């Protein structure tokens, strides 16, 4: 059994503030340890549950945040940016039986600690076939095309509620309870590590490869906080304005859909100015 862990940071233990996840800040240095603790707890739990291999794919910002030297020696870690499937890189090779979303968060325009979708503030909403979409929902549709089920999700309490919609059978662990976008009631690292390890052990038997999903076409709509970003986004082939601050595109598969999404957000981020967005 091989498990892939997609590891994001905003939903990690103790994280509530932008500086907690911004590489190079003192707070980020401190929170890296708690982030690593969450991920390693999942690693240990999956091995407890019978996994033969666990591959961690770093999925936050520079994708160079986890402390490799503090991970269980049986695990392997894919670190660094510019990967074809970004947050779920590694799922496409046909050897992954289940995936865990560790440190995830809710989507842009919704309640939740550090809620966003890919870009911190420029994207104010994302919809997939008319349903508001978090990164978790988007990624769940991508991995489903490879027959890989989501078996574990960790983050704040609202992230767990969000995951009930796209991975109802997955085990969920709330490491903190949402108070506002920048505040939460947090559990200690020792407690969350124990909870995540236990949940991962329970989740391991759910890692059974399924028939690849064929649910397309997929229409993705993005809303931005400034109208000029809609014009910028239409540089990407197939992307058209659908409103003053919105664009939309349709892809036959989520593989193509997520790659177009990444292209749009990359181009849009280059057009955001420091003072006015």
Where are these regions (language model features)?
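C-terminal accessory domains and tails appended to enzymatic cores
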Residues: 192-277
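Extreme N-terminal starter segment of soluble prokaryotic enzymes
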Residues: 1-4
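Active-site glycine-rich loop that binds ribose-phosphate moieties when present
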Residues: 83-84, 120-146, 154-158
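Short glycine-enriched loops at secondary-structure junctions
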Residues: 6-12, 59-60, 102-108, 157-158
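Active-site rim beta-loop-alpha module in soluble metabolic enzymes
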Residues: 142-204
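Short catalytic helix/loop segments, enriched in acidic residues and glycine
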Residues: 19-43
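N-terminal glycine-rich phosphate/adenylate-binding segment common to multiple enzyme folds
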Residues: 78-121
